[in-house]
Amino acid sequence: MELPLTSCVVRSWRMGDAEALARHGNNDKIWLNLRDAFPHPYTSHDAREFIKSLRHRTPETTFAIAVNGEAAGSVGFVLRQDVERVSAEIGYWLAEPFWGRGIATEALVAITDHAIATHALTRIYALPFAGNAASCRVLEKAGYVLEGRLRRSAIKNGVITDQLQYAFVVPDTV
């Protein structure tokens, strides 16, 4: 998949992205705001294994955010199951040199639209750590609405923290 946007291209991951992924992903500021499944330190081996793991996943739900041809981050969603099959959880990160340019917001809007159109979703939500003001602002600029605070719901780097629940809800057409 490839979605050309103004500030970036959201596209499928490629093996050639591994070095840029390792270079940008190996950053404390990024790791501190992601789930523990994201390794730290982030090595070239981690990057190659991650990209390889995506090859056989269908449907494709995890994408590179490329800026000037270089993988500079990731955006993806997890489709929920059973009675929540009309929902997905979304997540993203962008390399520090690209912060503050609207890139994450543009990528988030594009993938939100893609996920809704491709998977007949009615709701997409995100759970940033409460202290991640920049991510909360990205969500708000992308049309997500704060629904609540999940108190003491996560632990990162040995610290128990709150998460905020943001959601983009497709308007009811009935």
Where are the predicted features?
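Acyl-donor (CoA/ACP) binding surface of acyl/acetyltransferases
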Residues: M1-K29, T62-V174
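Conserved GNAT-fold acetyl-CoA-binding loop/helix
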Residues: K29-K52
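A short helix-loop-beta-strand connector motif used in the catalytic cores of GNAT acetyltransferases and
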Residues: K52-A64
